[in-house]
UniProtKB/Swiss-Prot annotation:
Binding positions for orotate per the UniProt entry: 120, 148
Keyword Cell cycle in annotation: no
Family label: Belongs to the purine/pyrimidine phosphoribosyltransferase family. PyrE subfamily.
Record-given protein name: Orotate phosphoribosyltransferase
EC number of the protein: 2.4.2.10
Cofactor(s) annotated in UniProt: Mg(2+)
Pathway of action: Pyrimidine metabolism; UMP biosynthesis via de novo pathway; UMP from orotate: step 1/2
Keyword Glycosyltransferase among record annotations: yes
Database matches in Gene3D superfamilies: 3.40.50.2020
GO biological process: 'de novo' UMP biosynthetic process; pyrimidine nucleobase biosynthetic process
EC primary class: transferase
The organism of origin for this protein: Bartonella tribocorum (strain CIP 105476 / IBS 506)
Length: 192
């Protein structure tokens, strides 16, 4: 599966939105990839996550003990990707604003891959790496369905992206004129 295949799946699900959006990262964009519209279709989600699992297998020679997803956005893709990898799926969730591996215990040295939905700045992955390190895990890599940075983001561990698709995003004080006149919508899940 390549980038165009991923974009085609998002188009099939009517999941590429145009307007003025405040992303989960806090950055602004004229394009929003509404993965919830994709993830509501099990067949489309299965295709994407099977493709991601194949890329993970090609990239990581070591055995993987767990796939871990950051809640909320990483729950569905981490679960479905773990199914294709044949390993358990766990998740981290925010407690007082900080990710924790709250509902699970893992052995020290457990080899994990973080799976996220869409990466813009990589903050959720970096925070997940910190939570897993605190739990004693070895993070082999992270992976995502779509890297909006076009391969430029640094998450602190290797990032395996099913698709790299650079979509412009802006700091709130650096909006282009055409975007600044549109009302902003915040569809993300960071504060949930």
């Amino acid at each position: 599966m390549n980038t165009q295949d991923v974009i085609d799946i998002f188009k099939q699900a009517d999941a590429i939105l145009e307007g003025h959006f405040i992303l989960t990262s806090g950055r602004h964009s004229a394009t929003y990839m509404q993965k919830a519209k994709v993830f509501m279709h099990a067949d489309l989600t299965e295709k994407l996550c099977r493709g991601l699992a194949e890329k993970i297998k090609e990239s990581i020679a070591e055995p993987i003990d767990y796939v871990v997803g950051p809640a909320i956005g990483g729950l569905i893709p981490s679960y479905e990707t773990s199914r294709h990898l044949g390993v358990p799926s766990l998740w981290v969730e925010r407690v007082n604003g900080v990710f924790e591996l709250r509902r699970f215990e893992i052995k020290k040295g457990a080899r994990v891959v973080i799976v996220e939905d869409i990466v813009t700045t990589g903050l959720s992955i970096r925070e997940t790496v910190e939570a897993l390190a605190a739990a004693g895990a070895e993070v082999l890599a992270s992976a995502c369905i779509l890297d909006r940075s076009g391969g430029k983001v640094d998450v602190g561990v290797p990032l395996i992206a099913l698709a790299e698709y650079e979509i412009a995003s802006y700091a709130s004080d650096a909006l282009p004129a055409d975007l600044s006149v549109l009302p902003a919508i915040k569809p993300g899940s960071r504060n949930i």
